[in-house]
Amino acid sequence: MPGLNASLYLGLSGLQAQQAALNVVGHNIANVNTPGYTRQRADLSAGQSQVEGQIYFGTGVTLSSVQGIRDRFLDLQIYRETAKQTGADERYAAVNAISSSLGDTGSTGIAAQVQAFFQGFQDLSTNPENAAFRTSLLGKAQAMITGLQTKYRLLDDQRANADQSIGALVGEVNTLTGQIAQLNQRIATEVTPGANNDARDQRKTLTDKLAGLVGINVVESPKGEYQITLDSGNAVLVTGTSAFDLTAKRSGNDGYLQVSSNMAGTVVDVNSAIKEGALGAKLDLRDNILVGFQAQLDQLAAGVAKAVNSVHQTVVGGLTTNYFFQSSTEANGSNGLPVSITASPALQSGPGWSTLFKGMVNLLSVNSDILANPSLITAGTGLAVGDNTKALAIAQLGSAAGTVEMGGTGIASFTGAVAALVTDLGTQTQTYKAQSTAQQNLVSALQSQRDSISGVNLDEEASNMMTLQRGYQASARFISVINQLTDQLVNQFGK
C-alpha cells in the first residue's frame, strides 16, 4: 500500500495540474482582444495506476495536452470564401470606377456624341451648301472621336493600374507563403504539448491574408504542416517547410506582366489559372473585363467608319476616294480608312461589320483633306444644287439596323450598340456589387461562427477559473492533511 509520501505526490500533482490549467485560462483572458487568437483548453488526465497486490492505486493527475479549439473544416471554408469575396470586391470597385464615364448618359456620353454626329448630317441635309453646317458637322465628328478615344484611354489606364497591382500582389503572395513555410517548420518540430498553438494561430492569420490575395486549397499533414496549392491545382505554393514563389515577368507580346510558378525547375504559366482573390480579379480585369469594353468601343468605331465611308465615298474612274474617316496611320486623304478593313469574314457580303484589329478607336480620325476643306463633305450624289441624298442617307444610319456587329452577340444599330455597351456595363456593375455583398455577408457569418467556436468567452473563462481555483484549494487542503498526519507519525514514533 502506498505510504504518506505517495499521498503527498498525489496532492502535488493536483496542485501542479490545476496551476498549469489556470495558466492556460490566464493566457486566454490575456488574449481576449488579440486578433486571430484561438482559445486554448488544458486537457487533464489521470496518472497511470500502480498495482499493490490485487489493488490498483492512482498516482494523481497530469496535464496531457493544451489544445487550440478550432474547426479545421470551417477554416478551409473561410479561406475559400474569402478569396471569392476579395475577387468580387476588386471587380466591383474597378467596374464601378469606370461606370460614370463609360455609362454617361449626358451630353458628353457616347450615346449623345454619336447621336450628335448623325444629327450633323441631318442638319446638313436641310441645306447642303451651308458652310456653317459643314463646320458644325466636323466639330461633332471630332467630338465623337475624342469622346471614344477618351473612354478607350480610361480603360487603358485601368488596365495599366491592374497590371501594376499584379506585380505588387505577387510579391505579397511570396512573402506570405515564405512565412507560412517557416511556421510549418516550427509546428512540425515542436514536441512540447500545446507549445505550437500560438504558431498555428499566426499561420491561420497569414493564410487568411493569403486567401484574400489568391484562391487556394489547403491540406494539413499528420505532422500539422500546411500544403497550399492554387485552387486550380496548377501550382504548389507551400509544401512542408518549402515555399515556391510566383514570378511576374513582362510579356514580349503586349508588355503586360505574366504570372508563372517555378517548382523544382519546372516553369508553369498560371496566368489563366488564378481566378479568385485580389490577384485573380486584377488578372481578369486586365485581360478580360476591361478588354471586353474596349472591344465594344472598337466595334462601334469600326461600324461608324464602315457605314459612313460606304455612303460618303466617291468613285471616279474606278478609283474610290474621299472617305469621310481615315486611319491616323494613313493620313493622306486619298487612302482614308478603307471600308474593307472592318468586314467580318463571315459577313463580307452582308450588313454587319466588326473590327479586325484591337485599338481601332485610337486610329480613327476625320479625313485630313476634309478637315482642311469642309466643302469636300459629300452631301449629294451629283453636282446639282441642293442635292442632299448622301447627307440624308448617312443621317439615317444613326438608327438603321444592321450596322454594328457586337462581338458575335448580334448585329445592331449604332444606338443599339451604345445601349448594349451601357447595359453591359450596368449589368456587370450590379452583378459584381451583388456578389460582393453576398460574399461579405457569407464571410462575416463564417467569421462569427469561427469566433463562437475559437474565440475567448470571458464568462466561460471565469467559470473555469473558479473551478480550477477550488481544485487547487482542495489539493492544497489534501496536502495539509497529509502533512499533519506525517507530523503526527513522526511525533509518535520519533520520540
Regions from the language model: what does each represent?
Residues 1-495:
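S/T-rich, low-complexity, solvent-exposed segments of bacterial secretion/appendage proteins
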